[in-house]
Amino acid sequence: MLLWLAAALVDLSALDATVRLDIRYATANNFLGRPVYAQARAFLRPEVAQSLVAAHAAVKTKGFGLLIFDAYRPLSVTRLFWNELPPEKRRFVANPAKGSNHNRGCAVDVSLYDLASGREVAMPSPYDEMSERASANFAGGPALARSLRDLLRSALEASGFRVYRGEWWHFDHHDCPRYSVLDLSFEALDAVSSLR
């Protein structure tokens, strides 16, 4: 059963190579300061990936592209996040007792990049910042940053996603409740894919 569930994840890069990846947990550029993924990959449920590609097409008409920071995340990584953070910061990560929508392959952490320059755009806060500036409705900061955050949100919501209010970058697909939590590495997902 678990293998069948894992086979239901697709590599986002195989669907649209113009969706850019900056998988922060495969680098030291994250709140832990060290890599936790062996590979910089983005896996999602097929329906979720198709919705994300549709949102990417929408922002391309405005001169931007989607920049993916994280997608499917093994449950063991969610446990690691929980255990590494002090209790007062745990509100910024999912409780591993329940699992997260990242663990289901139906959540994505995403920003925008400028198609002309190829650079990531400025948002009201950096990715993974654990502060009020990360809120999807934060009213401070530069107007342009808020405008770009709202463009991202509008495109994702029009494609079937809902923003997580505490993080402007985190979007859950409306189909999340139907998916099970998984705890398979990217390498294990590749092995399952090769059996198809």
Where on the chain are the PLM-derived regions?
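Extracytoplasmic cell-surface/polysaccharide-interacting catalytic and binding patches
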Residues: 4-71, 81-166, 174-196
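Segments that shape or occlude catalytic/ligand-binding pockets
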Residues: 74
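Short, well-ordered surface patches within globular domains
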Residues: 77
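Conserved metal-phosphate-binding beta-hairpin within the catalytic cores
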Residues: 171
